[in-house]
Amino acid sequence: MEKILSKVWISNGDSINQYVCIWDTGSMETIVSDKVISDLNPDKHGYVYINTIHKEKKSDKYILQLSLEGHSQSIKINPACFGKSREFDVIIGMDIIQHGLFILDKGKFSFTIDQLK
């Protein structure tokens, strides 16, 4: 099965950078890579334990804003960090997907969202 990749913009309130994200309906929360944390140096806001394919690990959580490709509204997120960057730096999880219409039809992907609070 093909990976569903798209662009996102992440901001710490002062700077904004573009990243590649993967859409993952198996992930409960949106998480970011070490690269995002290194680039933006966001404020820490708690911690969480995350499960990876290797083990459970403790990760700081951060305060960031995310903008999805094709959407003008930014979304406040409190992501943990999944570690080393791969071909993507953001994993979009069900905390965002559940608020919109997620369509995958014959390899074409679309996501629309009205409003997140």
Show where each model-derived region lies.
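Pepsin/retropepsin-fold aspartyl endopeptidases
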Residues: 1-117
